[in-house]
């Protein structure tokens, strides 16, 4: 018999979803080494380890530094309770459109099922901790004029789907975006 409480209310989970800007393609350097044993990540095999870049595993040959680890480290700077740990649930898939993030949809000829895979990993992680937020960084795949007109509506529906899966309609949602550029390449 153990005294461990599951899910642990001091294990704060963050679902990391989107495309390559979330997954990360940046060069790994000395700043990318694990430095906080209270910041963990869920591996592709669904095991918790100390977080390190690359956090995501969607495309191992190009995986690199993304915003996930920096986000968790920044969150820890403001956490006063020494019992709190952060668990990152990496689920981004580079090159996906928001339509590929709908239930039952796939990407790359069935290699990935972005939404379904994310929900499966989220539910596994929630056996150990409590979802505190969803971090989304996607949009380049939907940046043309036609797709961008319906993007916000689709994103709102997706957010609500994730919130329903976590049984908390008030789960905070953070969306990253790219800078606006006043030129067009021709």
Locate each region found by the language model:
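Cell-envelope and extracellular/periplasmic
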Residues: 1-186
